[in-house]
């Protein structure tokens, strides 16, 4: 649902894809199906507001089931689950009387995104988020590569200079979309506080990784010449991470916007309102810093 999970939220996302491939509900067939269950009393008005939220983030609708006192279901999807499979679904999802379970079906990445958004919205609107708590977690095993949904080309997911898990052998033998990177984040209450990686220090790995992403060695030399040349002399294995001190202070002060704890923050359009930047520069100023503007 998110690569920055807020563990103060007790709701969890359930994968029910395989189950719904055996049902007769056509909108779910051939799609990834995620679900979020919650035990709470929700009015008709609450459901309407949640549906409005769902359509506002791009969902076509928001299917759900309620578990009644006799352990039967109530909801728009009930009739599409065969009677002989209803007990199986209750066990699969861990449902109890009084639970409501919401469904998100789409391509895998979109279904995950929608599930994360619905989980957060339910947690906030039903006041389920734990108060006065800091819940930390490490997030790791990020994918090294991803496929662009528009161009269909493979590119780097995050940092192209990270070490792939499995090294050169993985790059030579595995499906690029199955390769993981040695990358990691520290997250607290849904905020990324620190991000880092084991950096690649091997020339062959760097050349092969960029080749998979569509860059030959000549492009690598031209775009990252300094690093390419440095690798000719060898580099030690190294790793690290960069802490976001401003984000830590934001959490401690319970601020929603990071600009509230930065002395002279830029606006949402990247303007420095105190200094009036960016602004026009003179030809003399450009010469002083050896910048030439070409039309």
Outline where the language-model segments fall:
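Structured aminoacyl-transfer and RNA-binding surfaces used for tRNA recognition/handling
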Residues: 1-295
């Amino acid at each position: 649902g998110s690569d920055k999970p807020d563990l103060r939220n007790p709701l969890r996302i359930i994968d029910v894809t395989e189950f719904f491939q055996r049902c007769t509900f056509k909108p779910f067939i051939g799609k990834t199906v995620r679900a979020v269950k919650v035990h709470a009393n929700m009015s008709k008005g609450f459901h309407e507001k949640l549906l409005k939220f769902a359509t506002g983030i791009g969902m076509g609708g928001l299917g759900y089931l309620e578990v009644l006192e006799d352990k039967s279901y109530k909801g728009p999807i009930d009739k599409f689950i065969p009677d002989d499979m209803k007990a199986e679904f209750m066990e699969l999802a861990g449902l109890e009387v009084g639970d409501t379970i919401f469904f998100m079906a789409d391509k895998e990445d979109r279904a995950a995104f929608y599930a994360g958004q619905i989980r957060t919205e339910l947690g906030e609107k039903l006041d389920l988020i734990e108060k006065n708590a800091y819940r930390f977690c490490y997030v790791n095993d990020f994918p090294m590569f991803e496929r662009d949904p528009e161009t269909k080309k493979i590119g780097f997911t995050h940092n192209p200079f990270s070490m792939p898990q499995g090294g050169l052998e993985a790059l030579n033998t595995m499906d690029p979309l199955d390769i993981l990177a040695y990358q990691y984040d520290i997250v607290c209450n849904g905020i990324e506080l620190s991000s880092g990686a084991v950096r690649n220090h091997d020339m062959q790995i760097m050349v092969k990784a960029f080749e998979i992403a569509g860059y030959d060695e000549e492009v690598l030399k031209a775009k990252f010449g300094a690093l390419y040349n440095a690798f000719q002399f060898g580099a030690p294995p190294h790793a690290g991470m960069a802490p976001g001190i401003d984000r830590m202070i934001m959490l401690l002060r319970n601020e929603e916007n990071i600009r509230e704890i930065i002395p002279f923050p830029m606006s949402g359009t990247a303007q420095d309102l105190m200094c009036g930047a960016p602004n026009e520069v003179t030809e003399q100023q450009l010469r002083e810093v050896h910048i030439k503007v070409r039309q």
